[in-house]
Amino acid sequence: MPTRRGCSGPCHFLASAFVLLLLPALNQSVVLPSTVPRAVQESKPLEPGPRTLSPLPPGPTAAQPRGQAQSEGAGPRGAESRNGSIPGAASEADGPEGKAGESSLGGSLAVSPNPSDKPMTQRALTVLVVVSAAVLVYFVVRTVRMRRRNRKTRRYGVLDTNIENMELTPLEQDDEDDDNTLFDANHPRR
């Protein structure tokens, strides 16, 4: 059987996990203009360097789904802040131009304008799912290979067993009568 070159199973596993952890850092500098929302694109140009998210205000917007939070941020939230039903929301929703602009979209939502900027928990979950899938594939391949090896063993039967590993020494025979064995195969009782 030829020897395998390169890394073994755990080495491939660790290497792929390391690459997955580095991918978000490598892709952070690449920004596709089609993925950035138009409001953010018009209000300020993209600056090179690390991007950070603004802190989330306390409230129900952090737990809402993405689509629901965006629709409420554009519609009823702006109306509530102008009516004065939520204190402090008017200063948060009004931008420098006096209208609900980028700050209401970016400040109240837990959504980054750049989809490649994922939260740490989402990255960890992605890595966990990929690693679990890799482990699952490894064990499935291992099981298939073991079955192929077992089929060959069944085909040849006794000839394929390792006789070197088997002990073929004769059993010790005691001539004493206080033996506790039920029967002796060499001298069956009649």
Curated annotation (Swiss-Prot):
Residues 172-181 have a biased composition (Acidic residues). One of its GO terms (cellular component) is membrane. It is a single-pass type I membrane protein. It comes from the Eukaryota. The keyword Lipid metabolism does not apply. Residues 30-123 are extracellular. It is found in: Membrane. Glycans are attached at residues 27, 83. The keyword Signal applies. Coiled coil: none annotated. Residues 37-119, 168-190 are annotated as: Disordered. Keywords: Glycoprotein, Membrane, Signal, Transmembrane, Transmembrane helix. Residues 145-190 are cytoplasmic. Residues 1-29 form the signal peptide. InterPro entries: FAM174-like (IPR009565). The chain crosses the membrane at residues 124-144. Belongs to the FAM174 family. This is Membrane protein FAM174A. It comes from Rattus norvegicus (Rat). The gene is Fam174a.
